[in-house]
């Protein structure tokens, strides 16, 4: 796998977390992107803090929409959570998978750490596999 696009609804939490963790583990060996189906106005600050606790950085991330060309060309599209819907173009080259990750909203830092650890485990398995 040379490239991956992580997607969630807002691109302010889960997909940014996954991208930051993937960058931490893969450094420059994999091209890493994140996007949202309905981009938020900003990053979820609990996500930023929880990712920093494990040595990754998403503080400079900016929520953005899915780039259709990127969707067509990446090797893997990973949807985080059950709410985001992605229509893959017929010409898409990569595989699509969904990770059922719990929603952290309004649950506080303890819940965010659980979500972070779920994402962390899945990212490591993805990069190893």
From Swiss-Prot:
Compartments it resides in: Cytoplasm
Induction trigger: By arsenite.
Segment forming the signal sequence: none
Enzyme's top EC category: transferase
A single GO BP: response to arsenic-containing substance
UniProt catalytic activity: mycothiol + arsenate = arseno-mycothiol + H2O
Its EC number(s): 2.8.4.2
Matching InterPro entries: Ptyr_pPase, Ptyr_pPase_sf
Family designation: Belongs to the low molecular weight phosphotyrosine protein phosphatase family.
Name listed for the protein in its UniProt record: Arsenate-mycothiol transferase ArsC2
């Amino acid at each position: 796998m040379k490239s991956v696009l992580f997607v969630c609804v807002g691109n302010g939490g889960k997909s940014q977390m996954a991208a930051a963790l993937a960058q931490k583990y893969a450094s420059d060996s994999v091209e890493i992107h994140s996007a949202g189906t309905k981009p938020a106005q900003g990053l979820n600050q609990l996500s930023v803090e929880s990712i920093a606790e494990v040595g990754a950085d998403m503080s400079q991330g900016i929520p953005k929409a899915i780039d259709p060309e990127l969707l067509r060309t990446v090797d893997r599209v990973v949807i985080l959570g059950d709410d985001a819907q992605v229509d893959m173009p017929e010409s898409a080259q990569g595989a699509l998978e969904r990770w059922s990750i719990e929603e952290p909203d309004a649950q506080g830092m303890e819940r965010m750490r659980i979500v972070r650890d779920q994402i962390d485990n899945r990212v490591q398995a993805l990069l190893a596999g």
